[in-house]
């Protein structure tokens, strides 16, 4: 008879210890990287996807990327000139809020900017995302791409999906085995939040409505202890004060 496996029970003290160790590792990792690399960048992420972030990490293996508790990262850099870990680096800490991270690298700024400007990935939207466009599926036979491409380049939606799209809100019927939309159907509207029903339909029709991209907010250069804010960085005006 096989031995029964007892489930591990983590005590509150163990959980708190692991949390403290994680924060300490992040804190020291940020400070050590600031000492070791020529540049530190602050970046934000739109439509976070771990798959694409992993690809970025792989592309920048000689560098270090941190994404974690922003308060810990800010504390590691220092909030004021008196407590900053390196001269002038505290000027960047006001940018550390939201979905942001740190990139430590020896690569020149032009190389970093060029890489991230070109690294844009289209993906399926998740519930809560804002629709970047308006799309209406036209009445009549429903095609697999829902009007995204010319019908002569498309194929009819398989009849087995009719119950599913109808359940998701599309007014459809089967006519001679063809999924048919009884009226124009507004799938999404630009500027409005998407719900789970809409995101499921978008994915079913192969329509990507999310864009993963990394925005560079500013960087610190060890040479000359200089700080540069990118024009698009939110909060840069406040940080420069």
UniProtKB/Swiss-Prot annotation:
<dbReference type="Pfam" id="PF17777">
    <property type="entry name" value="RL10P_insert"/>
</dbReference>
<comment type="similarity">
    <text>Belongs to the universal ribosomal protein uL10 family.</text>
</comment>
<dbReference type="Pfam" id="PF00466">
    <property type="entry name" value="Ribosomal_L10"/>
</dbReference>
<dbReference type="InterPro" id="IPR033867">
    <property type="entry name" value="Mrt4"/>
</dbReference>
<dbReference type="GO" id="GO:0042273">
    <property type="term" value="P:ribosomal large subunit biogenesis"/>
</dbReference>
<dbReference type="GO" id="GO:0030687">
    <property type="term" value="C:preribosome, large subunit precursor"/>
</dbReference>
<dbReference type="GO" id="GO:0005737">
    <property type="term" value="C:cytoplasm"/>
</dbReference>
<dbReference type="InterPro" id="IPR040637">
    <property type="entry name" value="Ribosomal_uL10-like_insert"/>
</dbReference>
<dbReference type="InterPro" id="IPR051742">
    <property type="entry name" value="Ribosome_Assembly_uL10"/>
</dbReference>
<dbReference type="GO" id="GO:1902626">
    <property type="term" value="P:assembly of large subunit precursor of preribosome"/>
</dbReference>
<dbReference type="GO" id="GO:0005730">
    <property type="term" value="C:nucleolus"/>
</dbReference>
<dbReference type="InterPro" id="IPR043141">
    <property type="entry name" value="Ribosomal_uL10-like_sf"/>
</dbReference>
<protein>
    <recommendedName>
        <fullName>Ribosome assembly factor mrt4</fullName>
    </recommendedName>
</protein>
<comment type="subunit">
    <text>Associates with the pre-60S ribosomal particle.</text>
</comment>
<dbReference type="InterPro" id="IPR001790">
    <property type="entry name" value="Ribosomal_uL10"/>
</dbReference>
<dbReference type="GO" id="GO:0030684">
    <property type="term" value="C:preribosome"/>
</dbReference>
<keyword id="KW-0690">Ribosome biogenesis</keyword>
<dbReference type="GO" id="GO:0180023">
    <property type="term" value="P:cytosolic large ribosomal subunit assembly"/>
</dbReference>
<dbReference type="GO" id="GO:0005634">
    <property type="term" value="C:nucleus"/>
</dbReference>
<dbReference type="GO" id="GO:0000956">
    <property type="term" value="P:nuclear-transcribed mRNA catabolic process"/>
</dbReference>
<keyword id="KW-0539">Nucleus</keyword>
<dbReference type="InterPro" id="IPR043164">
    <property type="entry name" value="Ribosomal_uL10-like_insert_sf"/>
</dbReference>
<dbReference type="GO" id="GO:0006364">
    <property type="term" value="P:rRNA processing"/>
</dbReference>
<comment type="function">
    <text>Component of the ribosome assembly machinery. Nuclear paralog of the ribosomal protein P0, it binds pre-60S subunits at an early stage of assembly in the nucleolus, and is replaced by P0 in cytoplasmic pre-60S subunits and mature 80S ribosomes.</text>
</comment>
<keyword id="KW-0963">Cytoplasm</keyword>
């Amino acid at each position: 008879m096989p031995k029964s496996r007892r489930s591990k029970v983590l005590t509150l003290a163990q959980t708190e210890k692991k949390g403290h160790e994680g924060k300490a590792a992040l804190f020291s990792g940020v400070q050590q990287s600031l000492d070791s690399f020529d540049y530190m960048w602050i970046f934000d992420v739109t439509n976070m996807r771990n798959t694409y972030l992993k690809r970025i990490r792989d592309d920048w293996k000689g560098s270090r990327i941190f994404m974690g508790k922003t308060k810990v990262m800010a504390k590691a850099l220092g909030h004021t000139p008196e407590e900053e870990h390196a001269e002038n680096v505290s000027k960047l800490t006001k940018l550390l809020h939201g979905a942001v991270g740190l990139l430590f690298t020896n690569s020149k700024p032009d190389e970093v900017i060029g890489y991230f400007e070109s690294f844009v990935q289209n993906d399926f939207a998740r519930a809560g995302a804002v629709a970047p466009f308006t799309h209406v599926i036209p009445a009549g036979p429903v095609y697999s791409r829902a009007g995204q491409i010319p019908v002569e380049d498309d194929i009819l939606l398989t009849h087995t999906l009719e119950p599913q799209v109808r359940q998701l809100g599309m007014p459809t019927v089967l006519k001679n085995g063809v999924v048919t939309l009884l009226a124009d159907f507004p799938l999404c509207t630009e500027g409005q939040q998407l719900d789970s029903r809409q995101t499921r339909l978008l994915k079913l029709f192969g329509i990507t409505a999310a864009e993963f991209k990394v925005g560079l907010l500013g960087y610190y250069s060890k040479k000359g202890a200089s700080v540069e804010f990118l024009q698009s960085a939110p909060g840069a005006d406040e940080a420069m004060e």
